[in-house]
């Protein structure tokens, strides 16, 4: 076979393999997020380690670590806001409700290798704190768009962590 035919054959084969390459694992998780698929992709695409995850365990670990980081950042933001706006509902969000968010993500991370069902449950339960914060603020007639956006993001990240850990085999 002459070099040009060999080059053409190799090019054709590589194009076939590239076109058959499956999407990244995080994209599969985001597809499962249904109507929130686009937001899921937007949140995760900028996380290079998550985008390069090679298997479901690695993906789950990276997603839950990311969730824990974002939950902690959100709680710290709320604690800072509490200093300038001491409303009881904001205090409850910053402490009680977001203690639950951070604690559930931390628990999920700790259970990944030993009890995937509990890790999955905890990832989902983390979103409850953000939801409860929204309810507490609404009852107190407090409308702070930054907190609403924060809660919305944490609920989405909780859903993403739930969907990622749901891919793990039961142990």
Region roles according to the model:
Residues 20-171:
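Folded extracytoplasmic luminal domains of secretory or organellar precursors
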């Amino acid at each position: 076979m002459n070099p040009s035919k060999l080059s053409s054959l190799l090019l054709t084969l590589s194009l076939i393999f590239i076109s058959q390459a499956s999407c990244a694992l995080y994209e599969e998780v985001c597809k499962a997020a249904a109507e929130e698929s686009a937001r899921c992709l937007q949140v995760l695409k900028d996380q290079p380690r998550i985008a390069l995850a090679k298997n479901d365990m690695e993906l789950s670990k990276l997603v839950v670590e990311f969730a824990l980081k974002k939950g902690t950042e959100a709680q710290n933001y709320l604690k800072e806001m509490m200093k300038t706006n001491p409303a009881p509902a904001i205090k409850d969000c910053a402490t009680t409700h977001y203690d639950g968010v951070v604690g559930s993500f931390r628990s999920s991370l700790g259970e990944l290798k030993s009890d995937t069902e509990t890790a999955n449950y905890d990832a989902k339960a983390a979103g409850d704190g953000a939801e409860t914060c929204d309810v507490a603020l609404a009852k107190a007639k407090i409308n702070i768009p930054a907190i609403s956006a924060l809660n919305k993001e944490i609920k989405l990240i909780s859903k993403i962590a739930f969907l990622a850990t749901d891919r793990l085999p039961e142990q």
